[in-house]
Structures are given as structure tokens and as C-alpha cells.
């Protein structure tokens, strides 16, 4: 049985679960028209589908815990999913990281982490959660939309001068106290 709970200091090593590969099979193309965000989906051809993996982080629980909350999804004692929420200046708590072990994807673990994150954000006085996803990580973008997030912005400059140049970050917002 999967349980979702806040990760305390005694379980601090759980915040460093390994990143695992995910497929790149399309791109979300947002546009802002008439005061409303819309998007199109560009699917890659089968031969252009690829897989990528983010570098592993080395999160320091003691340093981050001053302004972060860690949420873990557990199968028994094994942490198989992680959400990191960070304090933010405005009314939306920032979902800094969200990841689920490859063997558990498609089993609603990410949604369970979002649900617990919503509880935490409300308890801390936020009206919602925001996060960002790369436009070419179509699986993540569609996941956020499926879980009630809406597009709230587009950063087309963030990767300029890096190996990721040409990509954009889509900002997603979830209102939870409507």
C-alpha cells in the first residue's frame, strides 16, 4: 500500500531519490490570446522520440528545510516519489521538484503527491501552488493540466546560452481555495 507523508529529519536521506529517465515525445506550444492562455501539442515523429534524465540532485535537508517542505510517497519503507515545496513571496507555494520512480509511474503517485502538497499549501496560508515544466517535457505538462493546473506564463529566455537553448519553461498554477 502506498502512503504519502511529510518527510521528517529522521528520514532526510529520502529526499535524494535518484532521477530516472522519462520520454520526450512532443512539445507543448502555449499562446496568449485575448487575455487567455491556450496551447497546441506538437507530437514528435516516432524516430524523433527520445528519452532524457535530469542530473541527480544532492539536496541538503538541513539547509533546505528552513523554507521547504518535503513530501514522500512510500511503498513500505521505500521512498518512491518526492515533492519539494518551497515558501514563496506571493500567494502560491512553489512546487520545486516532483518525481516518481519509473516502476510506479501511471499509478497516480504523482497525483497523490499533488493532493498532499495542496493540503500543505492551504495549511500554510497559500491560495495555490505553482511550478514550471519544460515545453518539450509534454508528459509533465499534460500531467499538470490533468491535475487542475492552468498555464499562467511562458519563459522563453531562461535557457539562453545553455545546452538547453531553444526550450522554454511553461508556468503552471493551481488554485486550491476557490
Question: Which role does the model predict for each range below?
Answer:
Residues 9-10, 17-92, 96, 101-102, ...:
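Acetyl-CoA-dependent GNAT
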Residues 134-137, 147-150, 157-178:
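C-terminal "cap" of GNAT-fold acetyltransferases
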Amino acid at each position: 500500500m502506498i502512503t504519502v507523508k511529510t518527510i521528517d529529519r529522521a528520514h532526510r536521506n529520502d529526499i535524494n531519490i535518484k532521477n530516472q529517465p522519462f520520454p520526450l515525445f512532443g512539445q507543448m506550444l502555449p499562446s496568449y490570446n485575448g487575455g487567455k492562455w491556450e496551447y497546441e501539442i506538437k507530437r514528435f515523429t516516432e524516430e524523433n522520440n527520445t528519452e532524457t534524465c535530469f542530473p541527480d540532485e544532492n539536496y541538503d535537508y538541513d539547509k533546505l528545510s528552513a523554507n521547504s517542505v518535503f513530501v514522500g510517497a512510500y511503498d513500505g519503507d521505500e521512498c518512491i516519489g518526492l515533492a519539494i515545496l518551497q515558501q514563496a513571496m506571493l500567494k502560491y507555494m512553489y512546487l520545486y521538484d516532483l518525481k516518481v520512480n519509473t516502476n510506479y509511474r501511471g499509478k497516480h503517485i504523482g497525483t497523490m503527491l499533488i493532493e498532499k502538497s495542496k493540503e500543505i499549501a492551504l495549511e500554510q496560508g497559500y491560495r495555490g501552488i505553482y511550478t514550471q515544466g519544460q515545453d518539450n517535457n509534454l508528459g509533465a505538462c499534460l500531467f499538470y493540466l490533468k491535475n487542475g493546473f492552468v498555464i499562467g506564463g511562458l519563459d522563453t529566455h531562461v535557457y539562453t546560452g545553455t545546452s538547453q537553448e531553444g526550450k522554454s519553461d511553461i508556468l503552471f498554477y493551481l488554485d486550491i481555495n476557490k
